[in-house]
Protein backbone atom coordinates (compact mmCIF):
# COMPACT_ATOMS: atom_id res chain seq x y z
CA UNK A 1 0.00 0.00 0.00
CA UNK A 2 2.85 2.38 0.81
CA UNK A 3 4.21 1.94 -2.71
CA UNK A 4 0.86 2.37 -4.43
CA UNK A 5 0.16 -1.31 -4.89
CA UNK A 6 -3.08 -3.24 -4.62
CA UNK A 7 -3.63 -5.57 -1.65
CA UNK A 8 -5.11 -8.97 -2.53
CA UNK A 9 -6.29 -11.46 0.09
CA UNK A 10 -7.50 -15.04 -0.18
CA UNK A 11 -11.02 -15.77 1.13
CA UNK A 12 -10.26 -18.78 3.34
CA UNK A 13 -10.13 -18.31 7.12
CA UNK A 14 -7.46 -21.03 7.33
CA UNK A 15 -4.37 -21.00 5.14
CA UNK A 16 -4.72 -22.85 1.83
CA UNK A 17 -1.52 -22.84 -0.24
CA UNK A 18 -3.30 -23.99 -3.40
CA UNK A 19 -5.71 -21.05 -3.17
CA UNK A 20 -2.76 -18.71 -2.65
CA UNK A 21 -0.95 -19.83 -5.80
CA UNK A 22 -4.19 -19.76 -7.79
CA UNK A 23 -4.61 -16.13 -6.74
CA UNK A 24 -1.00 -15.40 -7.67
CA UNK A 25 -1.69 -16.71 -11.18
CA UNK A 26 -4.99 -14.85 -11.51
CA UNK A 27 -3.92 -11.46 -10.13
CA UNK A 28 -0.23 -11.56 -11.13
CA UNK A 29 0.87 -10.97 -7.55
CA UNK A 30 4.35 -9.46 -7.20
CA UNK A 31 4.84 -9.60 -3.41
CA UNK A 32 3.66 -12.09 -0.78
CA UNK A 33 3.75 -11.66 3.00
CA UNK A 34 3.99 -14.85 5.08
CA UNK A 35 4.94 -16.10 8.56
CA UNK A 36 7.98 -18.36 8.23
CA UNK A 37 7.94 -22.11 7.67
CA UNK A 38 4.37 -22.34 8.96
CA UNK A 39 3.31 -20.84 5.61
CA UNK A 40 6.37 -21.53 3.45
CA UNK A 41 6.30 -25.32 3.86
CA UNK A 42 2.68 -25.72 2.67
CA UNK A 43 3.44 -23.30 -0.17
CA UNK A 44 6.41 -25.43 -1.21
CA UNK A 45 4.38 -28.64 -0.99
CA UNK A 46 1.70 -27.11 -3.21
CA UNK A 47 4.27 -26.07 -5.82
CA UNK A 48 5.88 -29.51 -5.77
CA UNK A 49 2.54 -31.28 -6.10
CA UNK A 50 1.44 -29.12 -9.02
CA UNK A 51 4.75 -29.62 -10.81
CA UNK A 52 4.63 -33.41 -10.32
CA UNK A 53 1.09 -33.42 -11.75
CA UNK A 54 2.35 -31.66 -14.86
CA UNK A 55 0.37 -28.50 -14.09
CA UNK A 56 2.86 -26.11 -12.45
CA UNK A 57 1.61 -22.77 -11.20
CA UNK A 58 2.72 -19.66 -13.08
CA UNK A 59 4.49 -17.70 -10.35
CA UNK A 60 6.67 -15.66 -12.71
CA UNK A 61 5.10 -12.42 -11.45
CA UNK A 62 6.41 -12.93 -7.91
CA UNK A 63 9.42 -10.73 -7.19
CA UNK A 64 9.43 -10.80 -3.39
CA UNK A 65 8.28 -12.93 -0.47
CA UNK A 66 8.54 -11.28 2.95
CA UNK A 67 8.40 -13.18 6.23
CA UNK A 68 8.52 -12.33 9.92
CA UNK A 69 7.42 -13.77 13.24
CA UNK A 70 8.46 -17.42 12.76
CA UNK A 71 11.75 -19.02 11.72
CA UNK A 72 12.10 -19.52 7.95
CA UNK A 73 14.60 -22.31 7.32
CA UNK A 74 17.27 -22.03 4.66
CA UNK A 75 16.31 -25.45 3.28
CA UNK A 76 12.76 -24.31 2.52
CA UNK A 77 14.02 -21.05 1.01
CA UNK A 78 16.38 -22.96 -1.28
CA UNK A 79 13.60 -25.30 -2.39
CA UNK A 80 11.26 -22.37 -3.16
CA UNK A 81 13.96 -20.76 -5.28
CA UNK A 82 14.20 -23.93 -7.37
CA UNK A 83 10.70 -23.10 -8.64
CA UNK A 84 11.38 -19.42 -9.36
CA UNK A 85 14.19 -16.92 -8.77
CA UNK A 86 12.91 -14.15 -6.56
CA UNK A 87 13.96 -12.22 -3.48
CA UNK A 88 13.16 -13.80 -0.12
CA UNK A 89 13.29 -11.28 2.72
CA UNK A 90 13.32 -12.66 6.25
CA UNK A 91 12.75 -9.77 8.67
CA UNK A 92 13.41 -9.73 12.39
CA UNK A 93 11.54 -7.39 14.67
CA UNK A 94 8.82 -6.87 17.21
CA UNK A 95 5.97 -4.51 17.99
CA UNK A 96 8.56 -2.26 19.62
CA UNK A 97 10.77 -1.92 16.54
CA UNK A 98 12.58 -3.51 13.59
CA UNK A 99 15.96 -5.16 14.26
CA UNK A 100 17.34 -6.65 11.07
CA UNK A 101 16.78 -8.58 7.89
CA UNK A 102 18.16 -11.40 5.78
CA UNK A 103 17.81 -11.43 2.00
CA UNK A 104 18.08 -14.62 -0.04
CA UNK A 105 18.03 -15.28 -3.78
CA UNK A 106 19.61 -17.87 -6.04
CA UNK A 107 22.71 -15.69 -6.16
CA UNK A 108 22.70 -14.91 -2.43
CA UNK A 109 22.10 -17.98 -0.24
CA UNK A 110 21.86 -17.38 3.52
CA UNK A 111 21.78 -19.48 6.67
CA UNK A 112 18.75 -20.03 8.87
CA UNK A 113 18.15 -17.31 11.51
CA UNK A 114 21.13 -15.27 10.32
CA UNK A 115 20.43 -11.55 9.96
CA UNK A 116 22.20 -8.28 9.30
CA UNK A 117 21.38 -5.69 11.94
CA UNK A 118 19.63 -2.44 11.13
CA UNK A 119 21.53 0.79 11.93
CA UNK A 120 21.06 1.81 15.56
CA UNK A 121 20.74 -1.76 16.80
CA UNK A 122 22.98 -3.22 19.52
CA UNK A 123 23.45 -6.52 21.35
CA UNK A 124 24.03 -6.15 25.09
CA UNK A 125 25.06 -8.99 27.40
CA UNK A 126 23.32 -9.71 30.70
CA UNK A 127 26.36 -8.05 32.34
CA UNK A 128 25.46 -4.78 30.63
CA UNK A 129 28.33 -4.81 28.12
CA UNK A 130 28.04 -4.51 24.34
CA UNK A 131 28.76 -7.90 22.79
CA UNK A 132 31.92 -8.04 20.68
CA UNK A 133 31.62 -9.58 17.20
CA UNK A 134 32.93 -13.14 17.12
CA UNK A 135 33.02 -13.48 20.91
CA UNK A 136 30.26 -16.09 21.06
CA UNK A 137 28.66 -14.21 23.96
CA UNK A 138 24.86 -14.10 24.01
CA UNK A 139 23.07 -10.81 24.48
CA UNK A 140 19.74 -9.03 24.18
CA UNK A 141 18.98 -7.18 20.97
CA UNK A 142 18.17 -3.49 21.43
CA UNK A 143 16.77 -1.05 18.88
CA UNK A 144 17.00 2.75 19.01
CA UNK A 145 15.28 5.48 17.03
CA UNK A 146 11.52 5.83 17.47
CA UNK A 147 11.33 4.19 20.90
CA UNK A 148 8.01 4.34 22.82
CA UNK A 149 7.88 6.00 26.21
CA UNK A 150 6.45 2.82 27.68
CA UNK A 151 3.55 0.39 27.86
CA UNK A 152 0.19 1.79 28.87
CA UNK A 153 -0.29 1.47 32.64
CA UNK A 154 2.53 -1.08 32.95
CA UNK A 155 5.54 0.65 34.55
CA UNK A 156 7.25 -2.62 35.48
CA UNK A 157 7.31 -4.01 31.94
CA UNK A 158 8.20 -0.56 30.60
CA UNK A 159 11.26 -0.38 32.87
CA UNK A 160 12.35 -3.87 31.79
CA UNK A 161 12.01 -3.17 28.07
CA UNK A 162 12.93 0.49 27.51
CA UNK A 163 16.39 1.38 28.82
CA UNK A 164 19.29 3.71 28.17
CA UNK A 165 22.60 2.27 27.00
CA UNK A 166 25.63 4.51 26.45
CA UNK A 167 23.36 7.55 26.65
CA UNK A 168 20.92 6.28 23.99
CA UNK A 169 17.39 5.05 24.68
CA UNK A 170 16.74 1.52 23.38
CA UNK A 171 13.94 -0.99 23.26
CA UNK A 172 14.93 -4.50 24.45
CA UNK A 173 11.92 -6.76 23.71
CA UNK A 174 13.80 -9.82 25.01
CA UNK A 175 15.27 -11.49 21.92
CA UNK A 176 18.73 -13.02 22.38
CA UNK A 177 21.43 -13.44 19.74
CA UNK A 178 25.14 -13.85 19.15
CA UNK A 179 27.08 -11.65 16.74
CA UNK A 180 29.51 -12.97 14.15
CA UNK A 181 32.81 -11.40 13.11
CA UNK A 182 31.24 -10.08 9.91
CA UNK A 183 28.57 -8.20 11.88
CA UNK A 184 25.71 -10.58 11.09
CA UNK A 185 23.84 -12.13 13.99
CA UNK A 186 22.44 -15.54 14.80
CA UNK A 187 19.02 -15.20 16.40
CA UNK A 188 18.59 -17.57 19.35
CA UNK A 189 15.08 -16.73 20.50
CA UNK A 190 12.97 -14.92 23.06
CA UNK A 191 14.39 -14.95 26.57
CA UNK A 192 10.97 -15.56 28.12
CA UNK A 193 10.86 -18.93 26.31
CA UNK A 194 14.37 -19.91 27.39
CA UNK A 195 14.69 -23.33 29.03
CA UNK A 196 17.10 -23.56 31.99
CA UNK A 197 18.35 -27.13 32.20
CA UNK A 198 21.23 -28.27 34.42
CA UNK A 199 22.52 -24.70 34.63
CA UNK A 200 22.52 -24.20 30.86
CA UNK A 201 20.27 -21.96 28.75
CA UNK A 202 18.49 -23.60 25.83
CA UNK A 203 16.45 -21.60 23.32
CA UNK A 204 13.49 -23.53 21.85
CA UNK A 205 13.87 -22.04 18.37
CA UNK A 206 17.42 -23.36 18.02
CA UNK A 207 16.36 -26.89 18.99
CA UNK A 208 13.28 -26.74 16.74
CA UNK A 209 15.39 -25.79 13.76
CA UNK A 210 17.83 -28.64 14.41
CA UNK A 211 14.98 -31.17 14.65
CA UNK A 212 13.35 -29.87 11.47
CA UNK A 213 16.54 -30.56 9.53
CA UNK A 214 15.45 -34.21 9.57
CA UNK A 215 13.70 -35.16 6.32
CA UNK A 216 11.13 -37.05 8.42
CA UNK A 217 9.97 -33.99 10.38
CA UNK A 218 7.24 -31.63 9.20
CA UNK A 219 6.93 -29.34 12.23
CA UNK A 220 7.82 -29.18 15.89
CA UNK A 221 7.69 -27.05 19.02
CA UNK A 222 10.05 -27.33 21.97
CA UNK A 223 9.17 -26.54 25.59
CA UNK A 224 10.68 -26.91 29.04
CA UNK A 225 9.01 -29.07 31.69
CA UNK A 226 9.82 -29.13 35.40
CA UNK A 227 12.44 -31.71 36.31
CA UNK A 228 13.66 -32.64 39.80
CA UNK A 229 17.21 -33.35 38.63
CA UNK A 230 17.80 -30.71 35.95
CA UNK A 231 15.36 -27.95 37.00
CA UNK A 232 13.80 -28.15 33.56
CA UNK A 233 14.12 -30.69 30.77
CA UNK A 234 13.83 -30.13 27.05
CA UNK A 235 10.78 -31.75 25.45
CA UNK A 236 9.86 -31.68 21.75
CA UNK A 237 6.38 -32.10 20.29
CA UNK A 238 6.82 -33.29 16.70
CA UNK A 239 4.67 -34.01 13.65
CA UNK A 240 6.13 -36.10 10.83
CA UNK A 241 5.88 -35.82 7.07
CA UNK A 242 3.43 -38.15 5.35
CA UNK A 243 4.77 -41.69 4.94
CA UNK A 244 7.70 -40.88 7.21
CA UNK A 245 8.70 -43.09 10.10
CA UNK A 246 11.45 -42.34 12.60
CA UNK A 247 11.85 -43.45 16.19
CA UNK A 248 12.28 -41.14 19.17
CA UNK A 249 15.82 -42.42 19.71
CA UNK A 250 16.83 -42.01 16.07
CA UNK A 251 15.50 -38.45 15.98
CA UNK A 252 17.27 -37.64 19.25
CA UNK A 253 20.54 -39.02 17.87
CA UNK A 254 20.06 -37.00 14.67
CA UNK A 255 19.45 -33.81 16.65
CA UNK A 256 22.66 -34.33 18.63
CA UNK A 257 24.60 -34.22 15.36
CA UNK A 258 23.29 -30.70 14.74
CA UNK A 259 23.48 -29.08 18.21
CA UNK A 260 25.19 -29.68 21.56
CA UNK A 261 23.99 -32.78 23.38
CA UNK A 262 22.61 -30.90 26.39
CA UNK A 263 20.26 -28.99 24.08
CA UNK A 264 18.77 -32.14 22.57
CA UNK A 265 15.30 -33.16 23.84
CA UNK A 266 15.07 -35.60 26.74
CA UNK A 267 11.67 -36.59 25.34
CA UNK A 268 10.26 -36.43 21.81
CA UNK A 269 6.49 -36.77 21.57
CA UNK A 270 4.87 -37.50 18.21
CA UNK A 271 1.51 -35.92 17.30
CA UNK A 272 -0.60 -35.84 14.15
CA UNK A 273 -0.42 -32.05 13.96
CA UNK A 274 1.55 -29.36 15.74
CA UNK A 275 -0.96 -26.68 16.68
CA UNK A 276 -0.10 -23.10 15.84
CA UNK A 277 -1.94 -19.80 16.06
CA UNK A 278 -3.93 -18.82 12.92
CA UNK A 279 -1.09 -16.46 11.95
CA UNK A 280 1.41 -19.33 12.04
CA UNK A 281 3.14 -18.34 15.26
CA UNK A 282 4.15 -20.94 17.83
CA UNK A 283 1.53 -22.01 20.36
CA UNK A 284 3.83 -22.93 23.23
CA UNK A 285 0.94 -23.03 25.70
CA UNK A 286 -0.66 -25.85 23.68
CA UNK A 287 2.68 -27.65 23.24
CA UNK A 288 3.40 -27.57 26.97
CA UNK A 289 -0.08 -28.84 27.86
CA UNK A 290 0.26 -31.60 25.25
CA UNK A 291 3.65 -32.61 26.62
CA UNK A 292 2.42 -32.69 30.22
CA UNK A 293 -0.61 -34.75 29.21
CA UNK A 294 1.42 -37.32 27.23
CA UNK A 295 4.08 -37.69 29.94
CA UNK A 296 1.72 -37.84 32.92
Residue ranges with predicted function:
Residues 83, 122-143, 179-182, 244-248, ...:
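Conserved beta-loop-beta connector loops within the AMP-binding
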Residues 61, 85, 216-219, 261, ...:
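Glycine-centered tight turns that cap/initiate beta-strands
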Residues 289-296:
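Acidic/polar alpha-helix N-cap and adjacent early helical turns
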Residues 22, 37, 93, 144, ...:
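AMP-binding/adenylate-forming catalytic core of the ANL superfamily
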Residues 2-5, 22, 29-34, 44-110, ...:
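Gly/Ser/Thr-rich phosphate-binding loop
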Residues 89-96, 113-115, 223-225, 269:
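Beta-strand->loop->alpha-helix junctions that form or flank phosphate-binding loops
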Residues 7-27, 38-42, 46, 202-207:
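ATP-dependent adenylate-forming carboxylate-activation enzymes
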Residues 110-116, 161, 167-168:
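Short Gly/Pro-enriched turn/cap motifs at secondary-structure boundaries
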Amino acid sequence: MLTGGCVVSVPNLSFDADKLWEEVERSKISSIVIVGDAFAKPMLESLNKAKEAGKPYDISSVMLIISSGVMWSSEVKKALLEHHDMMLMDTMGSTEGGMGASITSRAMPTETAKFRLNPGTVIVSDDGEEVEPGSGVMGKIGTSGLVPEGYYKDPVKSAETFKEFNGVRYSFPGDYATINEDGTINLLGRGSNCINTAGEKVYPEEVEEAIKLSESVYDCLVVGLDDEKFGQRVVAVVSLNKNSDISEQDLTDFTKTKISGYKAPKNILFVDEVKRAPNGKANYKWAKAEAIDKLS
